């Protein structure tokens, strides 16, 4: 699966189109220049199919590319980062 992650700063979220207008989203805020990942949402009917992990991968890759520091308050994003040590250098707090 390849992800197409877009930052939507007006809505403070990263978006991943899933087809038919559906989106997987990761909500965030900005605190002291760091991206605080708050909540991840995948449509219920698509849960358990790996879209959350695909979204997390795309979000962390985007943040790494952009040189951002991250606080993962979202339990899903925090768990994903813990299982993927390559993103450890991005994490604060």
Where are these regions (language model features)?
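Residue-level recognition of conserved beta-strand positions in structured domain cores
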Residues: 18, 39-40
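Conserved acetyl-CoA-binding loop-helix of GNAT-fold acetyltransferases
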Residues: 48-60
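A conserved beta-strand-loop-helix scaffold within acyl/acetyltransferase catalytic domains
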Residues: 26-35
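A short, internal acetyl-CoA/4′-phosphopantetheine-binding micro-motif in the GNAT/acyltransferase core
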Residues: 41-47
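Conserved N-terminal entry element of GNAT/NAT acetyltransferase domains
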Residues: 1-7
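Structural motif
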Residues: 8-10, 31
